[in-house]
């Protein structure tokens, strides 16, 4: 069942927010939002609400793992953010619902205009009452000259089970287009029973010290973080098992040798944190998928099932 709430007001707002001159900024921009509400009925997770404004929406849910756990693809037809664009995604899972959310392609934040209008993306995910939530988007590419800001907020409870990752590529080295100017800020917050549990903020300027210093990106162009919680059964043992399995993975080891992939696996109490640096996105994606395959059975109780869209 898919109930979409498209009111006359939303349709009017969509027309108002199509590309054109903004009364607020004077810039050409999109302002788009997507609100999802999922619940469980008769052992089936359904998309109860999918309300959108602007060029942001979802396809119908796919159920490759059965009725309990849909895969939901979030679509942004323009493909990227230009000057003044703002995107907000809100998803709430209720009453034991389960879901995997992903995107079909890389997100992009393009060069801004001469006035430096910011491009902003905010994702708020509430899984406090959910059985499980997975947020596994494709990478975000930050173009030279962008003025981007991204925020991820996870609202959880002590009983929550979730895996979330973000991968960010600064510039396009393969096209000889490094991130030489502009700025990018990325904030990740986790609330646990409404109290702060995890906070991380990355603030970079083109060719600033954060790119080369040991405390920063160490000369790499791509970075990512994977967060998995909450591990109730021997979190330190689970962490060590995951670390040893990744170290023994010959495919991951080869990426470190040939692609300069660097990673570290730590934990904050029962929250497991995997961080990675590289010159390319693909090695980090492979690392995260390997970690996801290891952590998913322990946290969610099922084997990994990659979304079909990843293979296209």
Curated annotation (Swiss-Prot):
Basic and acidic residues biased stretches: 1-15
Signal peptide as annotated in the record: none
One cellular component (GO) term of this entry: cytoplasm
GO molecular function ontology, one term from the record: nickel cation binding
Keywords: Chaperone, Cytoplasm, Nickel insertion
Quaternary data: UreD, UreF and UreG form a complex that acts as a GTP-hydrolysis-dependent molecular chaperone, activating the urease apoprotein by helping to assemble the nickel containing metallocenter of UreC. The UreE protein probably delivers the nickel.
Family according to the record: Belongs to the UreD family.
Protein name: Urease accessory protein UreD
């Amino acid at each position: 069942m898919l109930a979409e709430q498209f009111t006359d007001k939303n349709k009017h707002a969509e027309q108002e927010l199509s590309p054109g001159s903004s009364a607020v900024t004077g810039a050409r921009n999109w302002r788009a939002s997507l609100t999802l509400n999922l619940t469980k009925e008769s052992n089936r997770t359904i998309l109860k609400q999918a309300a959108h404004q602007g060029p942001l929406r979802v396809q119908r849910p796919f159920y490759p793992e059965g009725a309990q756990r849909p895969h939901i693809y979030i679509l942004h037809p323009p493909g990227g953010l230009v000057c003044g664009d703002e995107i907000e995604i809100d998803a709430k899972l209720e009453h034991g619902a389960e879901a995997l959310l992903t995107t079909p392609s890389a997100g992009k934040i393009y060069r801004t205009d001469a006035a430096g209008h910011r491009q902003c993306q905010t994702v708020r995910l509430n899984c406090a009452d959910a059985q499980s939530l997975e947020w596994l988007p494709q990478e975000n590419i930050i173009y030279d000259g962008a003025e981007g800001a991204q925020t991820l907020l996870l609202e959880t409870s002590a009983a929550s089970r979730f895996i979330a990752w973000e991968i960010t590529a600064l510039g396009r080295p393969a096209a000889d287009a490094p991130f030489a100017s502009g700025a990018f800020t990325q904030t990740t917050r986790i609330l646990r029973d409404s109290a702060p549990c995890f906070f991380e903020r990355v603030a970079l300027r083109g060719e600033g010290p954060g790119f080369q210093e040991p405390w920063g990106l160490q000369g790499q162009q791509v970075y990512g973080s994977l967060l998995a919680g909450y591990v109730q059964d021997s979190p330190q043992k689970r962490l060590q098992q995951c670390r040893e399995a990744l170290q023994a993975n010959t495919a991951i080891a080869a990426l470190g040798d040939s692609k300069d992939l660097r990673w570290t696996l730590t934990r904050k109490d029962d929250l497991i944190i995997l961080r990675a640096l590289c010159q390319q996105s693909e090695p980090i994606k492979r690392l995260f998928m390997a970690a996801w395959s290891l952590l998913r059975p322990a946290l969610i109780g099922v084997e990994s099932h990659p979304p079909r869209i990843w293979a296209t």
